[in-house]
Structures are given as C-alpha cells and as structure tokens.
Amino acid sequence: VKTEPLNPLNKKSETNKNAVALIIGIEKYDNAPDAKYANIDAKYFAEYAKNIFGVEDNNIKILVDENATLANTNSAIFKWLPGKIKENKTELTIFYSGHGLSSQDGKKRYILPSNADPDLLSKTALLRKDLFDQIISLNPKTVNIFFDTCYSGVSRDEETLLASARPIRLVADDQEGEIPKNFNIFTASKSDQISSGLENAKHGIFSYFLMKGLEGNADENQDNILTNGE
C-alpha cells in the first residue's frame, strides 16, 4: 500500500474550550508481545486532537508505553475525566492503540494497560464496559472513541497474547450493552479479526487512515465536515 506522510498541520481548526481528549498508546508491554507502532499512533493523534478537534493542551491527557499502567489508566478515567467533563457541554474524544483481549467466554472485552497480564485479565486489565459506563455517568455532549485494537488474542505481528499459547482465537461477542446515541465508536477490526500495522507508514493501518481522513482525505463532498460515513 502506497502511503503519504501524515501531516497533522494540514488542517487547522479553532480552539474548542469544550473539547477534551484522552489518548493512550502502548507498543511495549511487560507481559505481552509488542503492539507495533501503537505508541507512535498515540503521539501523532495528540497533534490531530489539538489541530483538528481544537483541544487545548490542558485538556489533553496522553499515556504512552510505561506510563500507561493500569493505575495511571484508571486515574485518567476515574479521576482526571470527572474533573474535565462538563455535563451536556464537553465534546470528548478517546483514542486507544494497543492490545485488547476478550474473556474466555467471549462476553467481556478488555483493554490491556502496559503492565497487564493477559492470563489475569479481570485483575490486571481494564474492562471496556467500565470505561463506557464511566463516560455515560459523566454525560458529555458528544463522545468519539477510536480503538486501534482487536480482541482476537493475536498481536499485530500475529503472536498469541496468552502465555499458555492456546491454538485458538478468542472471539468476543458484539454485545456490550446499550450505547447512547451521542456515542460514536470506531474500531480497527471485528471481534475475530486482527488489527495490523502498516510497515511503510510506521503506524497501525486503522490509525494511519483515520488520521489521513482527519486531514481531509475522507471529506468526500468537500464540505469541511467529516461525517461517520466518510
């Protein structure tokens, strides 16, 4: 695939005092294979959040690699976000690039912080539903969530995430409770697919084309408004 360099300065929006962004990217894991380029994805997306969503520096929280522990991730979600979100006013963006994994029965999806143990999900990882429930309770005006991850139990380089190396891929159910209408959730892959890296761009495939789209490449009708369909 031929790729052009990303340019977060390609499109500039006015500052939006109501915009808040939480950005997490983890390439290096303590107990799992690397999620190639996920840290770069997050650092770049932070620039897009500033330039395209108009998020001010003091309204951005970014956690990368060793800083994206379970404790720091929980602190960002359950302490930092409540101090930033104003009910019915805040336009919230969340970006996560890294590993995800489903429970053995496929009913729960977890986001893996940098120090997670894939064999002890319920103790060391973040339940995705807990993230959603927290955001719902804070009641922001709009929510855009981008997940460059999959839940199949396989890394971007197709290494198994489980120490037991089971010869199966865990398939997550696509049921996660009712999501409010003001939520837009964009994911890199379906429950049984692998989220891949784009070698020549040095980004995840989803992240690269997402950010290219934010530059205006997805604005098919040239109205300067990016819709979900675009």
Where are these regions (language model features)?
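Active-site-proximal C-terminal subdomain of hydrolase catalytic domains
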Residues: 49, 64, 140-230
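Glycine- and acidic-residue-enriched helix-capping/strand-helix junction motifs
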Residues: 29-43, 47, 197-201
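Functional beta-strand-loop-alpha-helix junction segments that form "active/interaction loops"
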Residues: 1-8, 42, 47-90, 122-123
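Active-site-proximal beta-strand/loop segments in catalytic clefts of secreted hydrolases
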Residues: 22-27, 63-67, 95-99, 113-116, ...
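Disordered regulatory segments flanking catalytic cores
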Residues: 1-31, 82, 137-141, 160-163
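Structured segments of extracytoplasmic/periplasmic soluble domains
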Residues: 29, 48-52, 76-84, 134-138, ...
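Caspase-like (clan CD) cysteine peptidase catalytic core
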Residues: 18, 71-97, 101-160, 229-230
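Extracytoplasmic/secreted envelope proteins and their assembly/folding machinery
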Residues: 23, 39-49, 60, 70, ...
